[in-house]
Amino acid sequence: MFSKDQTLAKTDAELWSAIQKENTRQQEHIELIASENYTSPAVMEAQGTQLTNKYAEGYPGKRYYGGCEYVDIVEQLAIDRLKQLYGADAANVQPNSGSQANQGVFLAVLKPGDTIMGMSLAEGGHLTHGMALNMSGKWFNVVSYGLNDKEEIDYDAMERLAREHKPKLIIAGASAYALRIDFERFAKIAKEIGAYFMVDMAHYAGLIAAGEYPNPVPFADFVTSTTHKSLRGPRGGFILMKAEHEKIINSAIFPGLQGGPLMHVIAGKAVAFKEALAPEFKTYQQQVVKNADALAKALIARGLRIVSNRTESHVMLVDLRAKKITGKDAENLLGSAHITCNKNAIPNDPEKPFVTSGIRLGSPAMTTRGFKEAEATKVGNLIADVLENPNDAATIERVKAEVKKLTDAFPVYG
């Protein structure tokens, strides 16, 4: 029998210590990694429930185990809320990640050797859209589209490639693209050549839920996503689909890719979807966009170039070449000042992938803390201060002190 006072702190002091240090880091650092966010206490509470004990292979009402009557309620709540959030015909909330959601679509409609088309990783795409070392690049023939001279998606070239190669699946979506994507144009060319159309909206899901970014659901056969990032839920994935594709997607996820779903995580997803349906979430996402714009403008004013010269979402790529500093060094320097970001390749980057000429910045996490345009502008200036004085320890310490003032004034969990 377990005792209710058998806490983590008592059971595993080493692990507890590491978690407490991470908690302190999250509180005292400004988080600008575009794919990260802070989830709510309610989401974390759901993930820590007894649902973690339950195996539930199958789907609500069609399980391979007994005792699933209550987890059926949990999963159905998640499904219904998700469909309402995006106006979808059908939804699968079982994928353990965005990558597995993408794999579920691949398994449902493709065979090894089929041709797929996605955005080039080097120009802002995601590794699961055909990168050579990913299973998508190893199992399928990949045709990649990219950007034009304005660093916008080259839709004309994409259409030419689609007509020439006739891929079975066209993928839209990105991990480092700041502008709005014309999903309707992708859908038209997919229909013209008889291809399936999939959108990976992992980065934009929260913005889309709030109407701050175009919704791909009316145009795509399949829409995949993570549940964290801008959606602010637990780490996981989901798939939205047209009604006629529900059976093949469900079969692809279980038993095709996964066994028992993580019911405690699905509970966290259900909570996050309910939060995203609230009016406050729309206000939050509006501020996410405003803060990203303010951050980008502050950096531009300090002589830094933003790829595409603007952002229309939560994310931006910063070209560091004018400051004669690499993305790797910038990430480390900013980290020492308690500003967390990630190095990122820019289009046609001359540097190696682990070095890069840029950094990627995002506004969702700082907006969750309560930052508004004034704070976002200040953060932009603090970033520029560090990058302009990379060898000045006094600048690092001054910026760190300014960061501390901001994080004390805007705690993650009040």
Swiss-Prot record:
N6-(pyridoxal phosphate)lysine modification, residue list: K229
Pfam name, any one: SHMT
Gene Ontology biological-process annotations: glycine biosynthetic process from serine; tetrahydrofolate interconversion
One GO molecular-function entry: pyridoxal phosphate binding
Family annotation (InterPro entries): PyrdxlP-dep_Trfase, PyrdxlP-dep_Trfase_major, PyrdxlP-dep_Trfase_small, Ser_HO-MeTrfase, Ser_HO-MeTrfase-like, Ser_HO-MeTrfase_PLP_BS, SHMT-like_dom
Biological pathway: One-carbon metabolism; tetrahydrofolate interconversion; Amino-acid biosynthesis; glycine biosynthesis; glycine from L-serine: step 1/1
Record-linked CDD domains: SHMT
Keywords noted in UniProt: Amino-acid biosynthesis, Cytoplasm, One-carbon metabolism, Pyridoxal phosphate, Transferase
PROSITE patterns: SHMT (PS00096)
Site (Plays an important role in substrate specificity): H228
Binding-site positions, (6S)-5,6,7,8-tetrahydrofolate: L121, G125, H126, L127
Catalytic reaction(s) noted: (6R)-5,10-methylene-5,6,7,8-tetrahydrofolate + glycine + H2O = (6S)-5,6,7,8-tetrahydrofolate + L-serine
Gene3D superfamilies: Aspartate Aminotransferase, domain 1, Type I PLP-dependent aspartate aminotransferase-like (Major domain)
Main location: cytoplasm
Entry's localization field: Cytoplasm
Gene Ontology CC terms: cytosol
EC assignment: 2.1.2.1
Complex formation: Homodimer.
Family: Belongs to the SHMT family.
Role of this protein: Catalyzes the reversible interconversion of serine and glycine with tetrahydrofolate (THF) serving as the one-carbon carrier. This reaction serves as the major source of one-carbon groups required for the biosynthesis of purines, thymidylate, methionine, and other important biomolecules. Also exhibits THF-independent aldolase activity toward beta-hydroxyamino acids, producing glycine and aldehydes, via a retro-aldol mechanism.
This protein's name: Serine hydroxymethyltransferase
Primary gene name: glyA
